[in-house]
């Protein structure tokens, strides 16, 4: 769920801890790298924090998932339009949302793969 006019955040320029980047990159990798976890550590962390929501995620329809993501995307763009440029505040504000989105995507992908095989 993205804004076509800015190519999903690729045209939205910003500074992340002093380095030039774009909004898409922040959400693709920078928020994840912010915690400094290895992949194994992050997997365990996400399971520990969000595992209790697994059944709820699996019950969500494709439409509900899309609508949830649409609202998250809308909130990100609204926040960005008034953002002061403080990277620490941005990370504090959005890292949990990014983590939940990752967890939700992983659970839904696993479900689809299990359904296929």
Regions found by a protein language model. Give the residues of each.
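C-terminal accessory segments of proteins
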Residues: 3-117
């Amino acid at each position: 769920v993205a804004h076509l006019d800015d190519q999903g955040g690729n045209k939205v320029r910003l500074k992340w801890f002093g380095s030039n980047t774009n909004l898409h990159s922040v959400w693709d990798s920078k928020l994840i790298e912010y915690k400094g976890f290895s992949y194994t550590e992050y997997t365990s962390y996400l399971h520990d924090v969000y595992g209790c929501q697994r059944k709820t995620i699996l019950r969500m329809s494709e439409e509900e998932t899309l609508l949830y993501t649409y609202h998250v995307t809308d909130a990100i763009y609204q926040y960005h339009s008034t953002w002061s440029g403080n990277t620490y505040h941005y990370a504090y504000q959005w890292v949990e949302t990014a983590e939940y989105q990752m967890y939700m995507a992983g659970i839904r992908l696993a479900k689809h793969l299990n359904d296929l095989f």
